[in-house]
Amino acid sequence: MDMKRRIHLELRNRTPAAVRELVLDNCKSNDGKIEGLTAEFVNLEFLSLINVGLISVSNLPKLPKLKKLELSDNRICGGLDMLAEKLPNLTHLNLSGNKLKDIGTLEPLKKLECLKSLDLFNCEVTNLNDYRESVFKLLPQLTYLDGYDREDREAPDSDAEVDGVDEEEDDEEGENEDKEEDEDGEEEEFDDEEDDDEDEDVEGEEDEDKVSGEEEEFGHDGEADEDDEDEDEDEDEDEEEEESGKGEGRKRETDDEGEDD
């Protein structure tokens, strides 16, 4: 895929001004030059052109906010003066795997006042005697060369990233986490409300069961009392009948005695 088409795909319906990172690794550059990249990418902070067959960076547009440029595994042998002119705020530059042979080719980088990290792995220039001392002397603004400072201390991982880009990504991640936490909190609160409603329903059912039990018990007692009253009435009637029978018996006996007289 050629570089122009790759840039078009990477835009993803965005305007160039909305792009902050652009990765064009392994695409093809015609005549070894940058093409399709314009000054409209005014907010671009990270540009990667690894293994695209570049010979020259002369077509590089002015990118005032670019901080990190990846140019490793190309065929660049010079012409670095364009970098200082077009990328005034560049802090990280990777030229590893290019055809840079002597310290003189690096001299234009002196004008990159913000440059603090430079990588030249697998370039012939690294084979020169006193290579590191010479580069640090040539570029006093430099903090790290090939991942190490003047005292051979390794650069922290944070220095390998673009300042600002990562901070914004961290902010976005933080906002997403806060949003997720808020959503989780709302879900938990909703669950608690549901649990409370369920508890109230259970308590209501228990109260209803209790009332029903009391009514049922009361109902049984009432029926039992009515049965007892019926039995008492029957007994009273039997006693009255017996007394009536006894009275009639006495009357008959009295009548019989009168007849005998």
Swiss-Prot record:
A biological process from GO: regulation of apoptotic process
Pfam family, one: LRR_9
Keywords carried by this UniProt record: Acetylation, Chaperone, Leucine-rich repeat, Nucleus, Phosphoprotein, Repeat
Modifications the protein undergoes after translation, according to the UniProt entry: Some glutamate residues are glycylated by TTLL8. This modification occurs exclusively on glutamate residues and results in a glycine chain on the gamma-carboxyl group.
Subcellular location: Nucleus
Protein's organism: Ovis aries
Similarity comment: Belongs to the ANP32 family.
Signal peptide: none
Any one Gene Ontology molecular-function term assigned to this protein's record: histone binding
Domain LRRCT: 123-161
LRR repeat spans: 16-40, 43-64, 65-87, 89-110
Function: Multifunctional protein working as a cell cycle progression factor as well as a cell survival factor. Required for the progression from the G1 to the S phase. Anti-apoptotic protein which functions as a caspase-3 inhibitor. Has no phosphatase 2A (PP2A) inhibitor activity. Exhibits histone chaperone properties, stimulating core histones to assemble into a nucleosome.
Primary location class: nucleus
Biased composition range(s): Basic and acidic residues: 244-254
Phosphoserine PTM positions: S158
Chain positions found as Phosphothreonine: T254
Ranges annotated as biased composition (Acidic residues): 157-243
Modified residues (N6-acetyllysine): K86
Region (Disordered): 149-261
Subunit structure: Monomer. Interacts with histones H3 and H4.
Free-text domain note: Histone binding is mediated by the concave surface of the LRR region.
Disulfide bonds: none
Gene Ontology cellular component terms for the protein in this record: nucleus
Protein name, as recorded: Acidic leucine-rich nuclear phosphoprotein 32 family member B
PROSITE patterns tied to this protein: LRR
